[in-house]
Amino acid sequence: MALANFIDRAATAASQVLTDFHLGDFKAALEKQVVAVAFDDQAASCAEGQATLDLAVRLLARLYPVLAILPLDSASSFQAQALERLAKSINPKIGIRRSGKSAMVCLVAGATRPSLRCTTFFIGSDGWAAKLSRTDPVGSGSSLLPYGAGAASCFGAANVFRTIFAAQLTGAELDPDIDLSLYSYNKTKARDARPVDLPVDLGETHLVGLGAIGHGALWALARQSGLSGRLHVVDHEAVELSNLQRYVLAGQAEIGMSKAVLATTALRSTALEVEAHPLKWAEHVARRGDWIFDRVGVALDTAADRLAVQGALPRWIANAWTQEHDLGISRHGFDDGQACLCCMYMPSGKSKDEHQLIAEELGIPETHEQVKALLQTNAGVPNDFVVRVATAMGVPFEPLAPFVGQPLRSFYQQAICGGLVFQLSDGSRLVRTVVPMAFQSALAGIMLAAELVKHSAGFPMSPTTSTRVNLLRPLGSHLHDPKAKDSSGRCICSDEDFISAYRRKYGNSVEPLSNISAT
């Protein structure tokens, strides 16, 4: 068995949430763990249970070097083989155990209680509802919905992480139980009576950003029965090795693949008409003669990119994010008196330009003008520049020497964002950019997909603009966040020219925001 070949990126994410982090100690702690996934035929034979197991393995195999895959009856043994293949497609050197004797923690799907002497989390779902219990099996529902099932896997993986690294987490007690509807984000002990098996026409929908959150959304949409319509998937990048840390649909075979092409492949079993656009959003908009965007799912990394999407004036936007302390989803019309997407990301004060931020993260802020020139010209970084970075970072030059002559953005993404300097410094040189854990990005993506489907189906929307979840703490009792419309008058949703343009595109009718109870 061995840690995955992208473990340094996973370690970068962990370093941002764990106290007293040391790379060597972190890897040693992982190598001691055996994480079990146990299941019976009740889970293995239904769509919800299969979805829970699939995503649980996709999440766990990205971090832990040994998994115990444990079918609890003969009828479920066929599923074990598929899960083993899935785990090895992510980390070919992962250790697979067929006994739970050495397991430190276990996720259990189905209706059976395994005879294991370790911390156990029973996970499952019932339609829109995600379920977790510390004491009793929760089973898997009979619907074809993936949302509760996928969210349960994220809650389970988060509790596994909090169990193993409890000593380095503050306030990270374990969840005693969870019963949360992704339809309303209400906690409920009763069966969620919302529609579960129904055809949904997405109309013409855009999914912008096919990174970690986008992968979570694609995973869910690919498992949603009865979807039709046209889905535009927009992202200009290709999958890199470091992306495997949290891209739930990506394995070793997908490295180098266009993210837009991967999205098309993931959705090929659906009835969706998928159009891949391997472009930046601005390039896609410029090439598109029609600037009507009925529904846009936003899974982008930066505030600037989100502002650009809102600037194109889509009719309705669902926006998903991960940040240092939580993840979430926000919902936006424009001419409705509520917060638009720009209201959520309105800059205050003077923001630093990209070249200044990169120069600072390279440890040489005084060279920001040289960094600016290198970015603009796409010129290769000279030898003396790489030497200066190595000196500033306190790491040897030799491992960075292969980057001499490469474009600065490539050097920055691989050496800094990709975790090479982090590894060379034994984790002492932390990456400033927030790198979420895989279970955080996946849940944000599942929530995004759920919002797109609910909106397309005409289901009533949430009474609040946003919903937030912190997976590094027990699930909170108040998840709804009534984000107010920007009151400064600076936002485009207060600009008469933008309002007039929106009304010319879509008429004077506005999107209703509420109906689902937030209580």
UniProtKB/Swiss-Prot annotation:
Origin: domain of life: Bacteria
Principal subcellular localisation of the protein: membrane
Membrane topology, from the record: Multi-pass membrane protein
Segments crossing the lipid bilayer: 141-161, 202-222, 385-405, 433-453
GO cellular component: plasma membrane
Cellular localisation: Cell membrane
Keywords: Cell membrane, Membrane, Plasmid, Transmembrane, Transmembrane helix
Xref: InterPro entries: Prok-E2_C, ThiF_NAD_FAD-bd, Ubiquitin-activating_enz
GO molecular function: ubiquitin-like modifier activating enzyme activity
SUPFAM superfamilies: Activating enzymes of the ubiquitin-like proteins
Entry-linked Pfam families: Prok-E2_C (PF14459), ThiF (PF00899)
This protein's name: Uncharacterized protein y4jF
